[in-house]
Structures are given as C-alpha cells and as structure tokens.
C-alpha cells in the first residue's frame, strides 16, 4: 500500500471535508527516456509525444484496429465495464477506431479511443497518462484503477510496459496482485510510412497466456 504524496501537489489532500484532486506535472517523455534514447526515435514519434502534447492541444488520429481476447480476457473486459469500460468489451477485425489525445485538467494526457464495432453502439475507452513529481509514469482509468509504467525506446519504437497494477482509495494506492489482473501490459508505438503509425497492445497473464491483443494502423491528421 502506497500513500499518494508529492511536493508539487501530486497527492490527494483534503480541504475541510472536501477531497481535492491531485495536480500532476506535465509529462516530459524526453526526461523519462533520457536524451540519447529520445533522439533515437523517428521525428514523427517525437512530435506526437513532444512538448506540444502538454500544451492543451487536441489531436485526433483515425485508423482501424484488430481487437482480440481469449476467454479470460473477455471475462475481465466485461467485468471492468462496472468501473467505466477501461478495456474494449468486444472483439473484431478492421474495427474503425479514432483516438483523441488531449490534456487532462489535472496535468496528464488523455487517450480517448472510440471503437465502432459492427452492429454495436460506439464504445469509448479512455485512459490518462500521468507523471508524478517523483518521475513515475502512471496510466489511470475511471474507478481508480491504474498501472505504473516503464517507458523505453527500442529499435526506433516507443515501448510502455506495466510494472504493477493499483487501485486508488482516497489518499492510498493499493497494489493489486498480478494474478487478479488481465496480465502484464505491453504497448508499442512504431512509425510506419506515409504519415501513419502502428499501435500494438498486448496483455499476458502468467496462467491464462495472451488475454488481450490489439493492433492497428493510424493516420496523422492532415
């Protein structure tokens, strides 16, 4: 169990009986990666994750996704609908998908993904990346569920890997045992060609294997 603390306000605090939301510093991916690793990334990747991303600008990417899940992954995705749909609840191929990246008022960056599964209403899956003043990168969704992430640059691509899952309860982050999660998350952002990039996301569970898989090609806005 971890108390959410921080000198710059990255902690939940109270004003009287009112719980005040934390304010997080802007995400600086260059600082998280280190200068050499950052410079090894293609210019379009640096542009998408560069300082402009923290200036309040909204960017819309459109493309198609392949969305797959094994039985355990489908069970977890459906159960998570109780806390705001942090995982796509359906599967399909060539699913039209849009991603709106914009600033969160608390200082993080929101990735709002809208999936248009055939025969179903559009599904919004939203998560927010936050950086604490201790330099820890977090990704959180509704209901207080989140992951602590590591970010690396490998072979010209940006990689995000989960280190642990947690549930935020008031001023505390409670670690969730790995066996009770969809598994270790691994997200890859890789430059493609012609103003496009590939987004790949996998979850691997120690008992249930590859629980969730998503892969898609997205276009930069004109």
Give names to the regions the model predicted.
Residues 4-5:
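Leucine-biased recognition of intrinsically disordered, low-complexity hydrophobic segments
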Residues 10-12, 16-20:
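Targeting/processing segments of secretory and organellar proteins
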Residues 14-16, 116, 208:
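Intrinsic structural disorder/low-complexity segments
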Residues 21-193, 197-203, 214:
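Soluble ligand-binding/transfer domains with enclosed cavities or grooves
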Residues 204-210:
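Exposed beta-sheet edge/beta-hairpin loop segments within beta-rich domains
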Residues 217-222:
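Short beta-strand-to-coil "C-cap" segments at the C-terminal boundary of structured domains/repeats
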